[in-house]
Swiss-Prot record:
This is 3-isopropylmalate dehydratase large subunit. Keywords: 4Fe-4S, Amino-acid biosynthesis, Branched-chain amino acid biosynthesis, Iron, Iron-sulfur, Leucine biosynthesis, Lyase, Metal-binding. Binds 1 [4Fe-4S] cluster per subunit. Its cofactor is [4Fe-4S] cluster.
C-alpha cells in the first residue's frame, strides 16, 4: 500500500463522513474570526436561533479595518474616524461578547492580524484543521496544519456545526533544494515560484513545501511561503512538522501543557509525508538560482529578478497574455524593457500577514540602520503584525532605527495591504510593499503595487527606487 502525503493524513484524520457526490464533511479544530467576514454569519445564527457548537474552538480579533495611527487607537472605538470601519469593529466586539468568543480587542496588546496572532498565541497547532474568513489562512499550514480560507456562509456553518462540506484536493509538492544566497528570502522563493508556475499553477492542489531550503527556513519564513500559496492558485500550503515547529509552539498561551504536551508532540512528529507518498505534481526550484524578486505588473506572476527588466509584450506569442501585459504596463505606468531598478517609489509599506513578524522587521532595520529614507519618497511606514511583535521590536530598539531613518512606526493591523482602512495609495503612486497582492486598486484606486521582501522594501525606501539589497549591504 502506497504511503500518504501530509495533506492526505490530515484529511483522513478529520473526515467525518463521505457524501454521495464525492465531497466530504470535515471537522474543524480552530476557527479564527475578524470583523469583515463575520457579521452576516452571526446574524444568521441569531435568525435561526442556533448556538455555537464549540465556543472555545473560536478566537477573534479586528484587523482589516483598524486604524494604525496612535491618535485613532487611543480611547474607545469612537476614535475610529471612518463610520463603516468603526461599525464593523464594534459589531465584532458585540458578537464575541454575546456568543462568548475569546477576542483580542483593538486596544489589547495581543491584538493583531489574524494570521500573525494565531501562531503567536499557539492557537494554531500542528495537525489542526484551521479556517478563517480570509484567503491567506493558508499561512497556518506552516505548522503542519490543514488551513484554508472560507466564505461568509461557511463561517456561519463552522460556528453552528464545527464542520464544513468540501472536496478533497490533489497533492502538489514544491521541492526547494540548496542554500539561499545572502539577501534572498522566503518571500523571494514564493515570488519566484509564482513566476514559474503562474497564479493558476496550483489550482485544485494542496501544496506541500519541502526540501533542504524549506527545512532551513525559520517558522516565520515558512509562514511567508504558505501565506502566498493562494497567489499560486492553491487553496492550501503546508510544511511538515519538525523540531523547529515544536520549539516554536512550546510554551505559547494556547499550546498544550504537561502530559497533554507530551502526547501532542508524540502525535505531531508523525505529521510528515511518507517517503513513498505519491504527489500528482512536483515542482522543483534551486535556491542558488533565486535572486531578490520584484513584481512589476498587476498580478503576482508578473515578477522579475531585481537585475532584470520589464518584459516586452511584443515578444509574447500568446495573444491573451500579450493583451494582459499591455494592460498591466499601462496601468503601472511602465514601458517595455524598463530596468526594474529604474522604477521610482512614492511610498514604502513594510507589514501585512505576509511580512510583519519580528524577523521581517529585524531584516528591514538592518538595511535602514544609519541611513535615511530618500527625500523623493513621500511616505515609508512599518506596521507590526501584532501588539506583541511591536513590543518586542521596541525592546530591541528597532522602532528607533526606523524612526531615525524617516519611517513612520505604526500600531498593528492589516494597514496598506488593502484599501479598507485609512492607509491607502493615491492614484498613480508606486509602492514597494511587503504584502501579497498587487491587483489593480488593491492598495487604493489607481495605486501601483510592487511586491518585495522586507529587506528589498527597506533598500528601496533609502534609494528612492528599486535596488539590489545585496549591493547596498555589500
Amino acid at each position: 500500500m502506497a504511503g500518504k502525503t501530509l495533506y492526505s493524513k490530515l484529511w483522513d484524520i478529520h473526515e467525518v463522513a463521505r457524501r454521495d457526490d464525492g465531497s466530504s464533511l470535515i471537522y474543524i479544530d480552530r476557527h479564527i474570526l475578524h470583523e469583515v467576514t463575520s457579521p452576516q454569519a452571526f446574524e444568521g445564527l441569531r435568525l435561526a436561533g442556533r448556538p455555537l457548537w464549540r465556543v472555545n474552538a473560536n478566537i477573534a480579533t479586528p484587523d482589516h479595518n483598524v486604524p494604525t495611527t496612535k491618535a485613532e487607537r487611543q480611547g474607545s472605538l469612537l476614535s475610529i474616524a471612518d463610520t463603516v470601519s468603526r461599525l464593523q469593529v464594534q459589531t465584532l466586539d458585540e458578537n464575541c461578547d454575546d456568543f462568548g468568543i475569546f477576542e483580542f480587542k483593538m486596544n489589547d496588546v495581543r491584538q493583531g492580524i489574524v494570521h500573525v496572532i494565531g501562531p503567536e498565541q499557539g492557537a494554531t497547532l500542528p495537525g489542526m484543521t484551521v479556517v478563517c474568513g480570509d484567503s491567506h489562512t493558508s499561512t497556518h499550514g506552516a505548522f503542519g496544519a490543514l488551513a484554508h480560507g472560507i466564505g461568509t456562509s461557511e463561517v456561519e456553518h463552522v460556528l453552528a456545526t464545527q464542520c464544513l462540506v468540501t472536496q478533497k484536493m490533489k497533492n502538489m509538492q514544491v521541492r526547494v533544494e540548496g542554500t539561499l544566497p545572502w539577501g534572498v528570502t522566503a518571500k523571494d522563493i514564493v515570488l519566484a515560484l509564482i513566476g514559474k508556475i503562474g497564479t493558476a499553477g496550483g489550482n485544485g492542489y494542496a501544496v506541500e513545501f519541502s526540501g533542504s531550503t524549506i527545512r532551513a527556513l525559520s517558522m516565520e519564513g515558512r509562514m511567508t511561503i504558505c501565506n502566498m500559496a493562494i497567489e499560486a492558485g492553491a487553496r492550501v500550503g503546508m510544511v511538515a512538522v519538525d523540531e523547529k515547529t515544536i520549539q516554536y509552539v512550546h510554551g505559547r498561551p494556547f499550546a498544550p501543557k504537561g502530559s497533554d504536551w507530551d502526547a501532542a508532540v508524540a502525535f505531531w512528529r508523525g505529521l510528515v509525508s511518507d517517503p513513498d507518498a505519491h504527489f500528482d505534481r512536483v515542482v522543483e526550484l534551486s535556491a542558488e538560482e533565486i535572486k531578490p524578486q520584484v513584481t512589476w505588473g498587476t498580478s503576482p506572476e508578473m515578477v522579475s529578478a531585481v537585475d532584470q527588466s520589464v518584459p516586452d509584450p511584443e515578444r509574447e506569442t500568446d495573444p491573451v497574455k500579450k493583451e494582459s501585459l499591455i494592460r498591466a504596463l499601462k496601468y503601472m505606468g511602465l514601458q517595455p524593457n524598463d530596468p526594474i531598478t529604474s522604477i521610482k517609489l512614492d511610498r514604502v509599506f513594510i507589514g501585512s500577514c505576509t511580512n510583519s513578524r519580528i524577523e521581517d522587521l529585524r531584516a528591514a532595520a538592518e538595511v535602514v540602520k544609519g541611513r535615511k529614507v530618500a527625500s523623493t519618497v513621500k511616505q515609508a511606514m512599518v506596521v507590526p503584525g501584532s501588539g506583541l511583535v511591536k513590543a518586542q521590536a521596541e525592546v530591541e530598539g528597532l522602532d528607533k532605527i526606523f524612526i531615525e531613518a524617516g519611517f513612520e512606526w505604526r500600531e498593528p493591523g492589516c494597514s496598506m495591504c488593502l484599501a479598507m482602512n485609512p492607509d491607502k495609495l493615491g492614484s498613480g503612486e508606486h509602492c514597494a510593499s511587503t504584502s501579497n497582492r498587487n491587483f489593480e486598486g488593491r492598495q487604493g484606486i489607481g495605486g501601483r503595487t510592487h511586491l518585495v521582501s522586507p529587506a528589498m522594501a527597506a533598500a528601496a525606501a533609502v534609494a528612492g527606487h528599486f535596488v539590489d539589497v545585496r549591493e547596498m549591504m555589500r
